[in-house]
A protein has these predicted regions:
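Inward-facing hydrophobic residues that define packing positions of alpha-helical scaffold repeats
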Residues: 115, 122, 166, 173, ...
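N-terminal cysteine/histidine-rich coordination modules
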Residues: 1-85
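Structural signature of alpha-solenoid helical repeat junctions
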Residues: 131, 168, 172, 188-196, ...
Length: 250
């Protein structure tokens, strides 16, 4: 994908910060124009001309409050106080404040920085395990996208950066996995907008990638015997079951 092509799918919308009440612009994707190409085994959506994950964070440029879109307005009074004390009091607004007028795509580095600020905010406000896990998962996905972008350049001088990105991808992936395990045990469904079977499949796929075959097998089996799981998630679970069996026989 090129920056010029990606920019065609973006626009700025006005958002009101629930912490400092400032109004600012944030970059979002024109979802009606985006075509789904495919999904990775762990549900990351692929689009041909834009990495939509880069634009799923809202960050107030005036006070520093930052969160994924789905969690941005979901704050208790106590959490607002924690954010003001733990984030806003230390935040230094950029001189330009709002988004630049020209709509340009975020680099992976900028998108990752925004997500890391969202994760820090989630820690400060004592957010749910699922919010922290989902944020970590998306950071991991961004590193995956950045690795693919860097590898496509086929430059020897990028080898060290690719290795660093891969280490970060794995670290945040493990953190996301552990967070979702906690969320399944302590939260009610839906979790992050996903029903029980979708979450179970996601965690099973993550467990498979991390080598936790016992967890992956248990969750896949629960999906396959469920009377309420849909055909799509059952098909995915069956494919994952075949991969698990193949892996165990290596």
């Amino acid at each position: 994908m090129t920056a010029e092509k990606e920019a065609e799918y973006l626009f700025d919308k006005n958002v009101e910060c629930p912490v400092c009440d400032s109004t600012f612009r944030t970059r979002v994707v024109k979802t009606g124009r985006v075509r789904l190409l495919e999904s990775d085994f762990d549900l990351i959506a692929r689009h041909p001309d834009v990495d939509t994950i880069k634009y799923d964070v809202v960050s107030c440029p005036y006070c520093g409050y930052t969160a994924l879109n789905r969690f941005f307005t979901d704050l208790t009074r106590g959490q607002k106080m924690l954010i003001r004390e733990g984030v806003c009091s230390k935040f230094h607004p950029a001189e330009n404040g709002d988004e630049e007028k020209k709509i340009t795509p975020y680099s992976y580095d900028k998108a990752i920085d925004r997500y890391k600020l969202a994760f820090y905010n989630a820690l400060v406000k004592k957010g749910r395990a699922s919010e922290k896990a989902y944020t970590c998962l998306k950071i991991s996905w961004l590193y995956r996208g950045q690795i693919e972008q860097l590898e496509a350049e086929q430059r020897a001088d990028l080898a060290e950066k690719i290795q660093t990105c891969r280490q970060q991808e794995n670290a945040y992936y493990k953190q996301a996995y552990e967070g979702f395990i906690d969320a399944i045990a302590s939260e009610n469904f839906p979790i992050c907008g996903m029903d029980e079977h979708t979450v179970n499949y996601l965690v099973a796929s993550m467990a498979y990638k991390l080598g936790h075959m016992d967890v992956a097998s248990k969750l896949v089996s629960a999906i396959l015997v469920s009377r309420t799981a849909g055909r799509t998630v059952k098909d995915r679970a069956y494919d994952l079951k075949e991969q698990i069996i193949e892996k165990l026989h290596e």
